[in-house]
Regions:
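Helicase P-loop NTPase motor core of nucleic-acid translocases
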Residues: 1-181
């Protein structure tokens, strides 16, 4: 989309760069902010990115990959990645004249921001943080995607817990079908 409403939607500094946000991504962010606004612009970026990834068929936003290799994770152009870096860096308070590069920090700033994202707090929040590592979240899900993943995991674990006996003549039957090799 070349033009987006200004309501909490981060805009690239360069007009030559356009974000890949869909109207649904933007509506998701507006919905979240209409129910509980956040003053942290990284929260807005995370909400947009989670929705964007869901639209691409991914169940979650992997915060480690976002930090270490955003181009691979998002499949964006170099210009879009640079705009994301610039937007993210300008979103965080800093004392120095030039904003820090969040992608070169020693601790994942995306995970730190997600940790206090208001839309991922509580049992019925619209987003879920998962897979804690060193006290920081590793993934951000839309709640429905997280619930679907949990349901699949439970079903697989139930199947794995089921024990059944293998008939004694199974090896014989397999040899008859496939030979000794």
């Amino acid at each position: 989309l070349s033009t987006l409403p200004k309501f909490n939607v981060p805009q690239p500094a360069s007009t030559a760069v356009t974000w890949p946000w869909t109207p649904l991504d933007v509506a998701w962010l507006k919905f979240l902010n209409s129910h509980q606004a956040s003053t942290n612009a990284l929260h807005d970026l995370l909400a947009l990115l989670v929705s964007y990834q869901m639209g691409r068929g991914h169940a979650c936003l992997d915060l480690e990959l976002l930090w270490q290799d955003p181009a691979h994770l998002l499949d964006w152009s170099d210009a879009q990645i640079n705009a994301l870096k610039q937007s993210a860096s300008q979103s965080t308070p800093h004392a120095s004249e030039s904003p820090p590069d969040l992608f070169s920090e020693s601790v994942n700033p995306w995970a730190e921001a997600a940790q206090n994202m208001p839309w991922a707090m509580g049992e019925h929040s619209p987003m879920v943080l998962s897979q804690q590592r060193e006290g920081l979240p590793r993934r951000v899900y839309l709640r429905r995607a997280w619930q679907a993943e949990q349901s699949i995991q439970t079903a697989i674990q139930a199947r794995l817990a089921t024990h059944f006996e293998v008939p004694q003549d199974t090896e014989e039957k397999l040899k008859a079908l496939f030979g000794d090799e």
